[in-house]
Amino acid sequence: MELENIVANTVLLKAREGGGGKRKGKSKKWKEILKFPHISQCEDLRRTIDRDYYSLCDKQPIGRLLFRQFCETRPGLECYIQFLDLVAEYEITPDENLGAKGKEIMTKYLTPKSPVFIAQVGQDLVSQTEKKLLQSPCKELFSACAQSVHDYLKGDPFHEYLDSMYFDRFLQWKWLERQPVTKNTFRQYRVLGKGGFGEVCACQVRATGKMYACKRLEKKRIKKRKGESMALNEKQILEKVNSQFVVNLAYAYETKDALCLVLTIMNGGDLKFHIYNMGNPGFEEERALFYAAEILCGLEDLHRENTVYRDLKPENILLDDYGHIRISDLGLAVKIPEGDLIRGRVGTVGYMAPEVLNNQRYGLSPDYWGLGCLIYEMIEGQSPFRGRKEKVKREEVDRRVLETEEVYSSKFSEEAKSICNMLLTKDSKQRLGCQEEGAAEVKRHPFFRNMNFKRLEAGMLDPPFVPDPRAVYCKDVLDIEQFSTVKGVNLDHTDDDFYSKFSTGSVPIPWQNEMIETECFKELNVFGPNGTLSPDLNRSQPPEPPKKGLFHRLFRRQHQSNSKSSPTPKTSCNHRINSNHINSNSTGSS
């Protein structure tokens, strides 16, 4: 039994390390899998793609890189890209250096005498920006200037880009992105845990070598529990939220027996494990603060989509290889209709907000209560309304949430005590974060006084703890309880509409990020010499014929050999014998 677990872990660790070869986990045929189509095959895509500047040139990672390459080949446009880069750099500059960095931008790009002066930013706006820089520089100082540059770029430069070989190449990448996804797209590894409808296992994309977690939802189990809307809801929310602090959905596909969500893999274990199984319960405040800041950023990204998470607890916060966290398991998350409130008594005992327990209507407020519970538990080493391993009825825990105040030990600084107290306010209208400003109000609390959120969001701050890369932070394979067989449920054609809505293939932004991170983009995104067209982009050059299979090559070679033979009856007989022999062998090996 122990041997089986060791083997499963060893295979997984080798895959995580890239297999130990030069291809870093990529298939031998990865270039064939990601071979660009001839541009003539992309005409339908060209006609139907949404020609929105922000979508094509800013939001989509490969689109952004290709538009950048286009601008760098136009001397008059290169300075605009450099300006936007410097503004992005300014926004993550430490506060004490903002003044100097701001002056650098003003001098280089917003001074008329400069050789790279950007005239598209109006003089009135330049004057206002300069005045603010002298008074009190802030992170958003150049936002309006950057918007002016985007307003210019989305005009003539964008339309020129749409007629360039760089946009043609983008269409080729989109064609690859939209290819069917099946179980053969991946290699499967050990089971990592269980979800509500099936197992979660590690997997690896054959073409790129990138590791993911595959959440299998068994079709019969979904149907038996009438979980179709819940499963589709989670998939659609994951698809829309693009956040480095929430697990990303990269692929959604189906097999004969299951629906599969391919998600960011988090190899560092969950917060519950780290709070209770790594020395004394709880964290030092500095570590708790870092995780709280990243959780807050994840909530902010969800709330931006008007989505309330409703299940904040340590088990649902996962660590990656580097020690950064992501919110996982969006099964209870729900999108709130614009201008409306919802009702629903869902969540985990001890973490549900008073308004949820009382079945009142609510918006985003339960998530700020959940954040308060998490900060408290990370510092204290137990949840605010239930002792560690305390045996107590659900009704008693609910009563404590509604009627009692949490107790603070000497582990809490004044700032930590204050933020927990304000987040755990029982009246949601008075709770921190539940006013118009939302997460921005929480970020301004003194607890986060020394946290640079711009640098955090840019991934520039080092986590306080890095997981051991040689460890597998999950239960032994045989300790993960297996699901029983679902009986008495039959799948039929009436389920197909649901499956088609679920199985939509690759998700654009995560897929494009995968191509960039695994260096597939760098290696494949090659044009002709001196900025000329590559053969696959040349409309006057016909596409290469598809490669013939082994059987075709063998048969053709035999046919050519026989054509050279003398047409005597004896040779003709030998021809028939040889031809049959070749066919027999070919069929046997196919």
Curated annotation (Swiss-Prot):
Entry's Gene Ontology cellular component terms: cytosol; nuclear membrane; nuclear speck; plasma membrane
Main enzyme class: transferase
Activity regulation info: Inhibited by calmodulin with an IC(50) of 50 nM. Calmodulin inhibits GRK5 association with receptor and phospholipid.
SMART domains: RGS, S_TK_X, S_TKc
Domain Protein kinase: 186-448
GO molecular function: ATP binding; beta-adrenergic receptor kinase activity; G protein-coupled receptor kinase activity; lipid binding; protein serine/threonine kinase activity
Annotated stretches, region: N-terminal: 1-185
Catalytic function, reaction form: [G-protein-coupled receptor] + ATP = [G-protein-coupled receptor]-phosphate + ADP + H(+)
Motif Nuclear localization signal per UniProt: ranges: 388-395
Protein's GO biological process: apoptotic process; fat cell differentiation; negative regulation of apoptotic process; positive regulation of cell population proliferation; protein autophosphorylation; regulation of cell cycle; tachykinin receptor signaling pathway; Wnt signaling pathway
Region (Interaction with calmodulin), start-end ranges: 20-39
PTM description: Autophosphorylated. Autophosphorylation may play a critical role in the regulation of GRK5 kinase activity.
Location of the protein in the cell: Cytoplasm; Nucleus; Cell membrane
Functional note: Serine/threonine kinase that phosphorylates preferentially the activated forms of a variety of G-protein-coupled receptors (GPCRs). Such receptor phosphorylation initiates beta-arrestin-mediated receptor desensitization, internalization, and signaling events leading to their down-regulation. Phosphorylates a variety of GPCRs, including adrenergic receptors, muscarinic acetylcholine receptors (more specifically Gi-coupled M2/M4 subtypes), dopamine receptors and opioid receptors.
Family stated for the protein in its record: Belongs to the protein kinase superfamily. AGC Ser/Thr protein kinase family. GPRK subfamily.
Protein's name in the database: G protein-coupled receptor kinase 5
Source organism per UniProt: Mus musculus (Mouse)
Encoding gene (name): Grk5
